[in-house]
Swiss-Prot record:
Keyword Hydrolase listed: no
Protein family: Belongs to the ATP phosphoribosyltransferase family. Short subfamily.
SUPFAM superfamilies found in the cross-reference section: Periplasmic binding protein-like II
Function: Catalyzes the condensation of ATP and 5-phosphoribose 1-diphosphate to form N'-(5'-phosphoribosyl)-ATP (PR-ATP). Has a crucial role in the pathway because the rate of histidine biosynthesis seems to be controlled primarily by regulation of HisG enzymatic activity.
Comment, domains: Lacks the C-terminal regulatory region which is replaced by HisZ.
Protein name as annotated: ATP phosphoribosyltransferase
Superkingdom per UniProt: Bacteria
Pathway as given in its UniProt record: Amino-acid biosynthesis; L-histidine biosynthesis; L-histidine from 5-phospho-alpha-D-ribose 1-diphosphate: step 1/9
Catalysed reactions, as listed in the record: 1-(5-phospho-beta-D-ribosyl)-ATP + diphosphate = 5-phospho-alpha-D-ribose 1-diphosphate + ATP
Signal peptide, first to last residue: none
Length: 207
């Protein structure tokens, strides 16, 4: 049986619906407050999105389903098997309409919970940046005048508009990804590759 961690939060229902295509017994399980759901093929663990990559890397589980944004931010030693057809969002720079992205020689302040992504994508864009880590609503950065822009994921952009902000630039598009750790990929190679093949077939049908 393959142990797989899936994220709580916005992608939970989509992820469970996706896995039920490959393990019908998961349909019989009521989630409730359970953090572990046992199917016929998978043993599923519900984890906080930011903890999930650690569980995969440390081989607590064999596979994980997590957003590309978290993978790029944490830079853990994972085997990225393939992208999945849900969990779509965009990583963007956003700010007030009247503030331009043009270089002006000043230090640019960025509010974000994605510190590594902000530095990776923006240090080449601006010579001087200051990344301000926020764990809550990053839209407060410009509102409270502690940052010029924010870097964050958006799905519809509704929250940005409600707070008077607009997308300045899309850094990359993100979706859910299926990942493994090196050890599990070696020892469960046949099972994992068989599952990946089934996922690809389902993806082809959906496209």
């Amino acid at each position: 049986m393959i142990r797989i961690a899936i994220p709580t939060g916005r992608m939970l229902e989509q992820t469970l619906d996706f896995l039920r295509n490959f393990d019908k017994k998961l349909l019989d399980e009521e989630k409730g407050r359970k953090l572990r759901i046992r199917g016929e093929r998978f043993e599923v663990f519900l984890a906080k999105p930011w903890d999930l990559p650690l569980y995969v890397e440390e081989r607590v589980v064999d596979l994980g389903i997590i957003g590309r944004d978290v993978i790029l931010e944490q830079e853990r030693n994972l085997v990225n098997l393939l992208s999945l057809p849900f969990g779509y969002c965009k990583m963007v720079i956003a700010g007030y309409p009247h503030i331009s992205l043009e270089k002006n020689g000043k230090e640019i302040k960025i509010a974000t919970k994605y510190e590594n992504i902000a530095r990776k994508f923006l240090e080449d864009k601006w010579s001087k940046i200051k990344v301000i880590k926020l764990n809550g609503s990053v839209e407060l950065g410009p509102i409270l005048n502690i940052s010029d822009f924010i870097v964050d994921i958006v799905e519809t952009g509704k929250t940005l508009k409600e707070n008077g902000l607009e997308i300045k630039e899309v850094l990359f598009e993100s979706s859910a990804c299926l990942v493994s750790n090196v050890a599990s990929f070696v020892y469960l190679r046949d099972e994992i590759l068989s599952f990946v093949k089934e996922v690809r077939k389902l993806n082809d049908k959906c496209n």
